[in-house]
């Protein structure tokens, strides 16, 4: 069994306090010492918790593979291409939600943007997943669209 840790809420707490406490790089060190297998980081469009500097600092200092959760937008595709994480998970985002409230509706995503993301993820050997509701229809859609894996809501 493998263990992945989502580090986003360390940043949420840090941001609420208005200082660098808790420190993300110290949290990363704890994760590395615990020998976790994957570090999940969700860079939201509104930068609510993790910001760009956090993302690149974590990548630079991490011995753990990064799983980048992101919306399927041009901006996020550019950032992912620059970051070159081991994994990318496409997630839905609504500005007014506190946390992700459901899976991605794969019937409504931009096929043009997905094609662009699939092309560079295959070229760079990045495993691509979709965060979907646990329905046979969505799981089959993910497979048919070319995703490597699914994450279930």
Predicted regions and their residues:
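Short beta->alpha connector loops at strand-helix junctions that form conserved
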Residues: 42, 91-92, 153
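Conserved N-terminal beta1-alpha1 strand-loop-helix module at the mouth
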Residues: 1-85, 144
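N-terminal small/glycine-rich loop or linker at the start of catalytic domains
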Residues: 1-16, 94, 98-101, 115, ...
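Short, small-residue-enriched loops and turns at beta-alpha junctions
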Residues: 12-15, 43-49, 96-98, 104-106, ...
């Amino acid at each position: 069994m493998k263990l992945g840790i989502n580090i986003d809420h360390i940043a949420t707490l840090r941001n609420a306090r208005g200082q660098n406490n808790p420190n993300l790089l110290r949290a990363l060190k704890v994760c590395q010492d615990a020998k976790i297998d994957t570090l999940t980081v969700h860079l939201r469009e509104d930068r609510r918790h993790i910001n760009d500097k956090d993302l690149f600092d974590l990548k630079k200092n991490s011995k753990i593979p990064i799983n980048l959760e992101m919306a399927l937008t041009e901006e996020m595709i550019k950032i992912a291409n620059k970051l070159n994480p081991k994994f990318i998970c496409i997630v839905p985002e609504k500005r007014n939600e506190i946390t992700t409230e459901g899976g991605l509706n794969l019937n409504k995503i931009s096929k043009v943007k997905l094609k662009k993301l699939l092309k560079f993820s295959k070229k760079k050997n990045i495993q691509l997943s979709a965060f979907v509701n646990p329905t046979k229809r969505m799981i089959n859609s993910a497979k048919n669209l070319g995703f490597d894996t699914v994450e279930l809501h």
